[in-house]
């Protein structure tokens, strides 16, 4: 299932043995047929007439596409252990022997040929008919209903049965009556005169109900076709009593044919509940995939928790006294949310009254419901009010304010405006799905990563409080050579001047202009050519639909997403009406996301302007989809090098909080056996020397000692030369390594002097992420030491965690999941949780500061004076919290448990560009946050 099929894979004549008639039919297939078959997908080339893309049946009426195939390992893990007749398999042992791979591959070209013949005879259903069909059963069953692919629901509505069909039987038995081919080739008996309950029709014919099985036929041999089943498709081609004979007559020779049946059980149940099954499966497919088999229990527990989303109107019609007329949309339909909905008048009164009294809009309120505190966030636009209510114990108020902003941003990106999203009836199922995911992520964050280890689940849940609401994307720093290779691959794609993407190929204007792209690997952003606003819009969309965690665990075999989007950066009116400012073209914008394994490539396209104008609701063009796939395939060899970067030592170095709870002797020993410092050769010898036996915890002399010269400078003028007396710069190697080098004699001094000469060539601090050619000049031993970078001064590393946000480029850096996994203990996970929650509160203070500074700038008359006022009054904001913690499982009654103190400090930089830094370090550190910030941000570029 994870195999990638492309619509430009035209089989050669060598791949079609024993079929000389194919060349004659090629001549009969004229250009007019090709154009009509291509439809709105604008592929007039015959290369795309051989095989329809596998995602084509999943394109919706409005042109949107959300197609997800799981990886093979993921499908096997989700399938039930005991085989059933309706599990997701495309072949069974009775039909195709699994060990006989070559025999199975022999028939694959004939499947392509079969599709091509059906296309030429115009038996393939038209795309417009597929989109406009209101039938509950989709054409490509397994692709439309992803819950069947995951294997979560055992009893499935549709099943695929592979049977062996031999048209040579027709030479013995001549088909003279209608539907005889169905009996002769397949062994299925259908009585057209029987009175059978019809729940729907496909085409103009009657549904093919299985009334009997021919003894010895292929259907009976399979053991999977039952009386009462309905044959709905042959090789994903809709079949009814009208076209079944023509479809079967197109089979070129002996081959395996896939028959898609609707189960008899569901046919009978459909009459009493025709829509309920379809709605439930569509709205929770992705939820089931993300949260696993426990999704029903999770959703049930979530329904018992008070939470609600309401979109209300403030303009009521006094003439009509319709009940709940002010509610335009609300979710969910649960008893707990019903209580919140019943007090909506309070929210409307607060919104109107406080704005009239204070002149400012209300942002949040809190209320007690059955003894439980509920936070409610407000968002007012014109005469509409959006409310989101969540329990205070699950979602703190600062996070809820950020969450409602993210919801607004995502909905505007998807629909253009809130009214377009909430005021259209056809969007209600999509919004239900949207907020189903939203509340699951808010109330059950740990369950999202059910396949991960408990420590990883805990970190993901605790970090999501802060990281999911930052205006940026998680950035992974890579070596320069890898970065250049990624940039070249994306640049080639964005140029779009080759093959079918070139305007000269068809001698017509191209369909879309590629505005930019961004590449993710295992959930990390590794390369981006998008403006900051577009990057954040796309990242928030992917984050909401949990696409990044899926790619991180390689649960994606193939992912294709296509939809029209409304990036506010391009659509908002210009504040400056000057003619010199570049005006955005009046075009439409589309988002294409293609994922393969760990990779996910997001492409923003523009229709209009330099490209052709989009008419109606265009679906994805297979040429662009294939080019994006090709770009990802070109990066197959890069993933191993990126994995090496993820598996390497943390840069910068981190320490575990539990190491600081022990005594001096135990503390020194724990440092030598830590997974970080153990990579340094000879560390154990240094640790046992008397000069290094010093108590880190409780040694308050560390607080009063002067900082090293290299760390006292806030700029880059003399930051590198300050460590000349120490041999190594303190921020690049531990002091223990420096002492080891000095004890090695003259050879060590000579090597140290050589390194010093190299570093003194530059007058700036060494970049901790891109060491450049300096690494190449070092021997292997020196390279191992040099790669271990720490940001704090002193003999020991006291940095526990950090988050650095670069708002101009829309990225942030923080320790990777692999780096955090190396640090475990009794109090370190709690430290990480406290860090993210504390940073959330600190950032709320920073956001309020930015609002006040912005108001000051607007109130001042001259623009230049406003800039001076901002920079002169509060150029830097800093806020910190001191924590003390001790192990909770302390059993020694004679001794008091050790206590460790650590700081969580946040700093806001307004100039020269907005930046935010949050660090967690031991109380004994002498660094100030601005020094760490300089080292973190130095050289951090896309």
From Swiss-Prot:
**Protein family:** Belongs to the inturned family.
Acidic residues bias: where? 22-31
Q: Which disease does the record tie it to? A: Short-rib thoracic dysplasia 20 with polydactyly: A form of short-rib thoracic dysplasia, a group of autosomal recessive ciliopathies that are characterized by a constricted thoracic cage, short ribs, shortened tubular bones, and a 'trident' appearance of the acetabular roof. Polydactyly is variably present. Non-skeletal involvement can include cleft lip/palate as well as anomalies of major organs such as the brain, eye, heart, kidneys, liver, pancreas, intestines, and genitalia. Orofaciodigital syndrome 17: A form of orofaciodigital syndrome, a group of heterogeneous disorders characterized by malformations of the oral cavity, face and digits, and associated phenotypic abnormalities that lead to the delineation of various subtypes. OFD17 inheritance is autosomal recessive.
Q: Which SUPFAM superfamilies match?
A: PDZ domain-like
- Under which name does UniProt file this protein? Protein inturned
| Gene3D superfamilies membership | 2.30.42.10
Impact noted for substituting residue 500 to A: In SRTD20; uncertain significance; impairs recruitment of IFT43 to the basal body, but no effect on subcellular location, when tested in a heterologous system; no effect on the assembly of the CPLANE complex
**Residue ranges of the PDZ domain?**
185-263
Alphabetically sorted, this entry's keywords are:
Cell projection, Ciliopathy, Cilium biogenesis/degradation, Cytoplasm, Cytoskeleton, Developmental protein, Disease variant, Phosphoprotein
| Residue numbers of Phosphoserine PTMs | 670, 674
A Pfam family of the record is Intu_longin_3
**GO cellular component: a single term:** cytoplasm
Q: What does this protein do?
A: Plays a key role in ciliogenesis and embryonic development. Regulator of cilia formation by controlling the organization of the apical actin cytoskeleton and the positioning of the basal bodies at the apical cell surface, which in turn is essential for the normal orientation of elongating ciliary microtubules. Plays a key role in definition of cell polarity via its role in ciliogenesis but not via conversion extension. Has an indirect effect on hedgehog signaling.
Q: Cite the InterPro entries for this sequence.
A: CCZ1/INTU/HSP4_longin_1, CCZ1/INTU/HSP4_longin_3, CCZ1/INTU_longin_2, INTU, PDZ, PDZ_sf
Question: Which GO terms are recorded in the biological process aspect for this UniProt protein?
Answer: cell division; cilium assembly; embryonic digit morphogenesis; establishment of planar polarity; hair follicle morphogenesis; intraciliary transport; keratinocyte differentiation; limb development
Q: Outline the subunit composition.
A: Component of the CPLANE (ciliogenesis and planar polarity effectors) complex, composed of INTU, FUZ and WDPCP. Interacts with CPLANE1. Interacts with NPHP4 and DAAM1; INTU is mediating the interaction between NPHP4 and DAAM1.
Question: Where is composition skewed (Low complexity) in this entry?
Answer: 37-46
* Domain of life, per lineage: Eukaryota
For this chain, the annotated S-S bridges are none
Instruction: Output the SMART domains linked to this UniProt entry.
Output: PDZ (SM00228)
**Could you tell me where this protein is found in the cell?**
Cytoplasm; Cell surface; Cytoplasm, Cytoskeleton, Cilium basal body; Cytoplasm, Cytoskeleton, Microtubule organizing center, Centrosome, Centriole
Region (Disordered) residue ranges read 1-52, 704-754
Query: What lineage does UniProt assign to this protein's organism?
Result: Eukaryota, Metazoa, Chordata, Craniata, Vertebrata
The GO terms describing molecular function are: phosphatidylinositol binding
């Amino acid at each position: 299932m994870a195999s990638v099929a492309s619509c430009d894979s035209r089989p050669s004549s060598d791949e079609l043995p024993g079929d000389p008639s194919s060349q004659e039919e090629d001549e009969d297939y004229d250009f007019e047929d090709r154009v009509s078959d291509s439809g709105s997908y604008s592929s007039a080339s015959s290369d795309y007439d051989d095989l329809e893309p596998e995602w084509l049946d999943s394109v919706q009426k409005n042109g949107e596409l959300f197609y997800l195939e799981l990886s093979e390992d993921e499908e096997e893990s989700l399938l039930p252990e005991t085989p059933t007749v309706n599990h997701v398999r495309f072949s069974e042992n009775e039909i195709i022997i699994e060990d006989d791979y070559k025999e199975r591959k022999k028939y694959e070209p004939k499947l392509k040929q079969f599709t091509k013949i059906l296309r030429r005879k115009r038996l393939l259903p038209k795309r417009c008919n597929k989109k406009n069909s209101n039938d509950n059963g989709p054409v490509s069953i397994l692709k439309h209903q992803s819950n069947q692919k995951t294997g979560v629901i055992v009893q499935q509505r549709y099943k695929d049965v592979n049977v062996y069909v031999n048209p040579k039987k027709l030479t013995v038995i001549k088909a003279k009556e209608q539907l005889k081919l169905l009996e002769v080739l397949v062994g299925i008996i259908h009585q057209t005169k029987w009175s059978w309950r019809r729940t729907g029709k496909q085409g103009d014919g009657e549904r093919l109900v299985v009334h009997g099985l021919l003894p010895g036929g292929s259907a009976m041999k399979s053991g999977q076709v039952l009386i009462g089943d309905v044959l709905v498709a042959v090789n994903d081609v809709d079949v009814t009593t009208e076209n079944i004979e023509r479809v079967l007559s197109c089979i070129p020779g002996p081959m395996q044919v896939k028959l898609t049946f609707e189960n008899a059980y569901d046919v009978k149940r459909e009459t009493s509940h025709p829509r309920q099954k379809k709605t439930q499966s569509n709205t929770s497919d992705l939820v089931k995939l993300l949260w696993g088999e426990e999704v029903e229990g999770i959703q049930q527990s979530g329904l018992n928790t008070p939470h609600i989303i309401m979109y209300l109107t403030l303009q009521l019609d006094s003439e009509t006294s319709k009940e709940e007329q002010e509610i335009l949309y609300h979710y969910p339909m649960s008893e707990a949310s019903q209580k919140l909905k019943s007090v909506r008048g309070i929210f409307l009164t607060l919104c109107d009254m406080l704005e009239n009294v204070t002149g400012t809009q209300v942002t949040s309120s809190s209320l007690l419901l059955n003894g439980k505190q509920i936070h409610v966030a407000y968002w007012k636009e014109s005469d509409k009010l959006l409310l989101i209510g969540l329990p205070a114990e699950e979602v703190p108020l600062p996070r809820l304010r950020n969450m409602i902003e993210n919801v607004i941003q995502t909905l505007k990106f998807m629909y253009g405006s809130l009214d377009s999203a909430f005021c259209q009836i056809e969007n209600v199922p999509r919004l239900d799905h949207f907020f189903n995911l939203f509340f699951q992520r808010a109330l059950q964050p740990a369950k999202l990563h059910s396949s991960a280890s408990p420590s990883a689940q805990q970190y993901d849940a605790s970090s999501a409080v802060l990281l999911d609401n930052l205006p940026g994307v998680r950035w992974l720093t890579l070596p320069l050579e890898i970065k250049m290779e990624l940039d070249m691959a994306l640049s080639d794609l964005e140029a779009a001047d080759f093959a079918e993407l070139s305007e000269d190929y068809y001698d017509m204007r191209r369909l879309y202009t590629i505005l930019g792209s961004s590449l993710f690997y295992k959930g990390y952003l590794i390369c981006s050519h998008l403006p900051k606003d577009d990057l954040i819009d796309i990242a928030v969309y992917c984050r909401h639909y949990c696409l990044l965690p899926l790619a991180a665990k390689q649960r994606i075999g193939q992912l294709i997403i296509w939809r029209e989007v409304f990036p506010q950066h391009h659509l908002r009116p210009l504040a400056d009406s000057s003619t010199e400012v570049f005006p955005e073209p009046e075009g439409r914008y589309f988002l294409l996301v293609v994922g393969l394994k760990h990779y996910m490539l997001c492409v923003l396209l523009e229709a209009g302007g330099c490209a052709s104008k989009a008419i109606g609701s265009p679906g994805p063009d297979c040429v662009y989809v294939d080019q994006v796939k090709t770009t990802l395939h070109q990066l197959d060899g890069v993933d191993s090098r990126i994995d090496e970067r993820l598996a390497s030592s943390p840069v910068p170095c981190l320490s575990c909080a539990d190491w600081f709870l022990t005594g001096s002797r135990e503390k020194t020993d724990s440092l030598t056996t830590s997974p970080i410092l153990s990579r340094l050769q000879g560390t154990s010898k240094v640790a046992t020397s008397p000069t290094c036996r010093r108590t880190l915890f409780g040694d308050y002399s560390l607080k009063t000692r002067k900082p090293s010269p290299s760390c006292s400078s806030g700029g880059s003028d003399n930051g590198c030369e300050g460590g000349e007396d120490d041999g190594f710069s303190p921020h690049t190697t531990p002091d223990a390594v420096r002492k080891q080098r000095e004890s090695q004699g003259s050879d060590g001094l000579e090597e140290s002097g050589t390194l010093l000469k190299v570093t003194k060539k530059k007058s700036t601090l060494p970049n901790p992420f891109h060491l450049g050619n300096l690494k190449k000049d070092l021997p292997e031993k020196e390279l191992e030491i040099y790669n271990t970078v720490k940001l704090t001064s002193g003999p020991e590393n006291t940095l526990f965690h950090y988050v650095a946000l670069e708002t101009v480029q829309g990225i942030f850096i923080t320790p990777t999941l692999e780096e955090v996994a190396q640090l475990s203990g009794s109090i370190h996970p709690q430290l990480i949780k406290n860090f993210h929650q504390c940073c959330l509160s600190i950032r709320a203070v920073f956001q309020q500061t930015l609002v006040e500074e912005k108001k000051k700038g607007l109130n001042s008359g001259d623009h230049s004076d406003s800039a001076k006022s901002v920079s002169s009054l509060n150029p830097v904001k800093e806020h910190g919290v001191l924590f003390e913690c001790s192990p909770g499982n302390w059993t020694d009654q004679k001794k008091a448990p050790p206590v460790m103190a650590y700081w969580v400090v946040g700093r806001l930089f307004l100039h020269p560009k907005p930046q935010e830094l949050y660090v967690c370090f031991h109380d004994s550190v002498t660094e100030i946050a601005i020094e760490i910030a300089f080292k973190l941000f130095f050289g951090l570029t896309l």
